[in-house]
Amino acid sequence: MILALDVGNTNITCGVFDGDRIKASFRITTKMPRTSDEYGMLLSTLLERNQVGMDDIHDAIICSVVPNIMHSLQNGLIKYFNIRPIIVEAGIKTGIRIATPNPQQIGADRIVDAVAAYELYGGPVLVIDFGTATTYDMVDENGTFMGGITAPGIRISAKALWEDAAKLPEIEIKKPDNILGKDTITSMQAGLVYGQIGQTEYIINKVKEETGMYDAKVVVTGGLGRIISNETENVDVYDPDLTLKGINLVYRKQNRKGVK
């Protein structure tokens, strides 16, 4: 089985794949600094909790947007699993062509999202990932990555409100019953959630208009993607595991035999 690791700014999402099937998944907080031993032992423990033994993992692949933890994470896999993981980075085989002047500037997470959206749902496809940042990326019918958009994520926007406005509290991010808030909390929730819905619908329509790809599928992923996709008719698919699936698809293109 393959261990796929999606290293984001908030969490490391881990998926165990048996072929194209996700056998188990779990998360580790990214922000806490850890040693290679801590990563190795933590991964071993969490795998066991999900009925997966260390010896069941014969290879690993990492997709990361957080460079400063990569050394410890890679060494943890080498030391505890005897695996030198594949890293999703510039030059790796993905099956899609990146039609931008500087392909190396496109985040690894965006590439694997694009791979998964195109291979699983076909093109043209607009993939939206509601993570720490909200990203929109377009892939045409031939599998060409055309470009994308990066916007502040809902949590970043929320954090800016309660950190920079003295009287605004930290709140739970959820859809309120009405768009017109009746108090501070519900008015903040309305602004955050409905503001994101409005942004999403506008960008979807604008991308389709500029590209002329009005038949493009819209595929959504990310932690808060379910809230947004449930509130707009412009989204075709919500796939919470899209990024992990993309990492696994990229792994399978490398034709690498497992270490063990």
Curated annotation (Swiss-Prot):
Keywords noted in UniProt: ATP-binding, Coenzyme A biosynthesis, Cytoplasm, Kinase, Metal-binding, Nucleotide-binding, Potassium, Transferase
Enzyme Commission (EC) number: 2.7.1.33
InterPro entries in alphabetical order: ATPase_NBD, Type_III_PanK
Keyword Manganese among record annotations: no
Residues the record lists as binding K(+): 129
Uppermost EC category: transferase
GO BP terms, alphabetized: coenzyme A biosynthetic process
Pfam families xrefs: Pan_kinase
S-adenosyl-L-methionine as UniProt keyword: no
GO CC term (a single one): cytoplasm
Necessary cofactors: NH4(+); K(+)
Binding site for substrate: 107-110, 184
Active site, renumbered: 109 (proton acceptor)
Subcellular locations according to the entry: Cytoplasm
Protein's job: Catalyzes the phosphorylation of pantothenate (Pan), the first step in CoA biosynthesis.
Family named by the database record: Belongs to the type III pantothenate kinase family.
Subunit structure, as described in the record: Homodimer.
Protein name, as recorded: Type III pantothenate kinase
High-level lineage: Bacteria, Bacillati, Bacillota, Clostridia, Lachnospirales
Recorded name of the encoding gene: coaX
